[in-house]
């Protein structure tokens, strides 16, 4: 799937995002599984998953460049190739990143395809890819750290969030299967515990992105930086789990995170969510800190709708109405459809991009699909 398109769908770059082969594969297969068994949706999902099979690094053994899903169906995450981040049109390698998010998005695509097609190879590939991702979190030798751990060891919330969401999707499509020695539900518990104990700072009213090894706040630009949209996405992952389990404690945790990060992120002057903030309200070094990106608003629409559904509290109805109205007024393109991705603080368009290596059919359709299910 191409994602680098201009406002009217004109192709801007034929390079392909491996993230979006997984994300789009999951989205279209999920629509097929939950909304309508439209053969076109399954065809798109199949195309994305077939392409994913070609996006791994070469491996030095007799099986050569065999499809990733075939390898995973036998190896269960052990000694399997790492997926690229970007590839050329024909899947030739371009860029490999240090982290393993391509693998997590591949896992959810394989899981949704397993449910749609009942092909066991996809079931096993989904389990194997999640195992690869979990190994990257738990074994520090697997993923290169962003900063030298000898000088400043840190931990990030991102892998725990994505592990939680990935385990939720595998459980939804495959059942509560065992992955790397634990059930999906047990991994979800582990992720929520890490987020609650290490990253949520109630005394500061924030969910941190990066902390020290013992959960301490480190007083530097990169480690003081908050991402309200990311934190609000985490909040609804937890609220989603609370709804499945009818768990009041999890619901409170999700609501607490949503409440404090909404306060941190919502722009009282122009509306919309700031991209970055500082834990101590100091200046942020990234020059795009006050811009409005499409995806945090999609996550906030889900989070506020879910909070309203779970509690009936009119506060969340007002928050939902505010972010929904602002988003559809400023991001939506009434002529060509879809959403623009990047706005200045006051809501003016930064450019006309509809898609890129980072923006594709995931956050917006997931928001529309999830809210329609509530």
Give the role of each language-model region:
Residues 1-374:
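Glycan-recognition and catalytic cores of secretory/periplasmic carbohydrate-active enzymes
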């Amino acid at each position: 799937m191409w994602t680098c398109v201009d406002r009217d769908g004109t192709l801007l770059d034929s390079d392909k995002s491996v993230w979006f082969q997984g994300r789009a594969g999951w989205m279209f297969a999920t629509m097929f599984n939950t909304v309508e068994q439209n053969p076109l949706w399954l065809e798109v999902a199949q195309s994305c998953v077939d392409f994913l099979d070609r996006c791994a690094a070469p491996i030095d053994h007799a099986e050569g460049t065999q499809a990733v899903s075939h390898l995973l169906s036998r190896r269960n995450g052990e000694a399997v190739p790492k997926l690229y981040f970007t590839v050329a049109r024909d899947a030739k390698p371009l860029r490999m990143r240090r982290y393993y998010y391509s693998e997590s998005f591949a896992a959810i695509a394989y899981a949704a395809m397993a449910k749609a097609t009942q092909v066991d190879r996809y079931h096993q590939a989904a389990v194997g890819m999640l195992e690869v991702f979990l190994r990257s979190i738990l074994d520090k030798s697997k993923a290169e750290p962003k900063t030298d751990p000898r000088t400043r060891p840190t931990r990030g919330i991102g892998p725990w969030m994505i592990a939680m969401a990935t385990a939720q999707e595998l459980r939804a499509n495959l059942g509560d299967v065992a992955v790397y020695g634990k059930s999906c539900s047990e991994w979800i518990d582990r992720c929520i515990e890490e987020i609650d104990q290490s990253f949520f700072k109630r005394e500061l009213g924030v969910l941190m992105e990066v902390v020290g090894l013992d959960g301490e706040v480190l007083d530097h630009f990169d480690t003081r930086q908050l991402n309200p949209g990311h934190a609000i996405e985490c909040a609804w992952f937890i609220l989603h789990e609370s709804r499945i389990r009818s768990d009041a404690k999890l619901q409170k945790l999700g609501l607490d995170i949503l409440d404090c990060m909404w306060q941190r992120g919502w722009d009282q002057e122009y509306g919309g969510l700031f991209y970055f903030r500082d834990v101590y309200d100091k200046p942020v070094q990234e020059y795009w800190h006050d811009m409005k990106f499409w995806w945090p608003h999609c996550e906030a629409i889900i989070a506020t709708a879910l909070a309203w559904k779970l509690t009936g509290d009119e506060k969340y109805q007002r928050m939902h109405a505010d972010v929904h109205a602002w988003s559809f007024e400023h991001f939506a393109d009434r002529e060509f459809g879809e959403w623009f991705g990047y706005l200045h603080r006051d809501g003016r368009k930064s450019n006309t991009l509809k898609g890129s290596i980072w923006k594709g059919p995931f956050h917006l359709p997931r928001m529309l699909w999830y809210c329609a299910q509530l």
